[in-house]
Amino acid sequence: MLMTTTPTIEGRTIRSYHGVVAGEAIIGANVFKDMFAAVRDIVGGRSGSYEKTLRSARETAFEDLAEAAGRLGANAVVGVDIDYEVLGEKNGMLMVAVSGTAVTVE
C-alpha cells in the first residue's frame, strides 16, 4: 500500500477516490506516565525503550490505515496526516492517529 503526505503521487494517476480512512493506536496510562518520568531522569538524553513503544504505536496506526484503505479497494492513501493526542484521566494515555484519502492509482 502506497502512503504519502502529499495530495498526489508523482508519476502515478489517481483513477478513483474511495473516501477518508483512519487508523489509531493508544499507548496505555502507565507507559505514558513512565515515559515522562524517564525523560525527567535522563535530562538531555533519549529513552530508547519509550521511543520504541511510540514507534510501535505509530506503526500500528499506519497498519490500521492501510487495512481500512484496502477494504475500500484502494491501493494507495494520499494526504496522510499524523496526529498525537493526550487523552484520559490525568492525561494518562497517548493516541497516535493517522488519516488520509484512500485512492486507486495506476
Curated annotation (Swiss-Prot):
Pfam name, any one: YbjQ_1
Segments crossing the lipid bilayer: none
Family: Belongs to the UPF0145 family.
NCBIfam families attached to this UniProt entry: PRK02877.1 (NF002776)
Protein name as catalogued: UPF0145 protein AZOSEA16190
Organism: Aromatoleum aromaticum (strain DSM 19018 / LMG 30748 / EbN1)
